[in-house]
């Protein structure tokens, strides 16, 4: 199956945009999921508050 140059260009640009979105969107997505779920309780039952500051400075 032969593809026209315009179709090849479109597919290439789509792959580039998808790659960019996945590379730059993965970490924020994981952080979002962490904030949405919340922290898991420690073995003694204490739940530590989850905030941006606790992510940066433990």
Swiss-Prot record:
Protein's UniProt keywords contain Ribonucleoprotein: no
Intracellular or extracellular location(s): Mitochondrion outer membrane
Domain of life according to the entry: Eukaryota
Gene behind the chain: tomm-7
Gene Ontology BP annotations: mitochondrion organization; positive regulation of protein targeting to mitochondrion; protein import into mitochondrial matrix
Keywords, ordered alphabetically: Membrane, Mitochondrion, Mitochondrion outer membrane, Protein transport, Transmembrane, Transmembrane helix, Transport
Protein name, per record: Mitochondrial import receptor subunit TOM7 homolog
Lipid bilayer topology: Single-pass membrane protein
Subunit structure: Forms part of the preprotein translocase complex of the outer mitochondrial membrane (TOM complex).
Record InterPro entries: Tom7
Membrane-crossing residue ranges in chain numbering: 17-35
Phosphoprotein is among the record's keywords: no
């Amino acid at each position: 199956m032969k593809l026209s140059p315009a179709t090849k260009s479109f597919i290439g640009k789509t792959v580039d945009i998808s790659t960019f979105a996945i590379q730059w969107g993965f970490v924020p997505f994981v952080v979002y999921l962490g904030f949405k779920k919340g922290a898991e309780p420690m073995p003694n039952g204490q739940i530590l508050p989850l905030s941006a500051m606790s992510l940066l400075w433990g």
